[in-house]
Amino acid sequence: MAAFTEIRPHVVVIPFPAQGHINPLLKLAKLLHSRGFYITFVNTEYNHHRLTRSRGPGWATAGLDGFRFETIPDGLPPPSDENSTQDVPALCASTRATCLAPFRDLMARLSRAADVPPVTGIVSDGAMGFTVDEDFGVPVLLFFTHSACGCWSYCHIGELVRRGYTPLKDESFLTNGYLDTPIDWIVGLENIRLRDLPSFVRTTDSDDVMLSIMVRSAAHDAPHAAGIILNTFDDLDGPMLDGIRSKFPNLSTPSAPSRPSPSSSSPRSPVTFGRKIPSARRDDGVVGGYFQSTY
């Protein structure tokens, strides 16, 4: 086991606990695993129990060698319907407020475990940016599961607040034509209207949870992460990625990766995540990639 732990990079992957976030993070985790990484995938206890009821006992330990599941609480009381979808704003607020401590405890347990390689990196959902608030001694990358256009839009939520576009004065602004206000100052999105931006801007609440989280994500979480992962590349989303770089000048992205051949016989050796990253910040912080559907 000593030789195993010395050579195999170990990435902890933590998605936001909603289906549209779990699936992309799980896909990325499986792709990393196929390239030689040891993976710890972190679910919330509530979602893990739902998966166990759906797929049967032992599902989390069956199948892939070097791919394990761990759980942390989400901080919410269990709903009366054990299969119900949780309220997203409440879940966002709760994970931000309560998940760092149990995640820290999990990282400590992994560091003491003799049967797993040392953790060499963390890939966190962009909506779980509390992971950048702690010095875990390894790079923390944020994976934003929405499009590059969505990411670039989120980067401007704070400026929309500062310029007075949002929160709305009252609910009449939802129907009086105000949402058709042109927003012509976002580079790459010059011909959009307020209604075309993420729906969080339509709130009338100055303390809106989702609005606050989006502002913090762009102002604090992304700049403090080792990098940002987007499922795209320059040839596809060049203007949006140029905009993201202008917001975070320490970040860049590689050119479009070539699509792997299904019959490729290239060795599945570990790539450079974790093992060759000397600190928690790199110049090439935005990572673009092609996610082939192989699982």
Please give the residue ranges for each predicted region.
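Glycosyltransferase specificity loop/lid
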Residues: 1-295
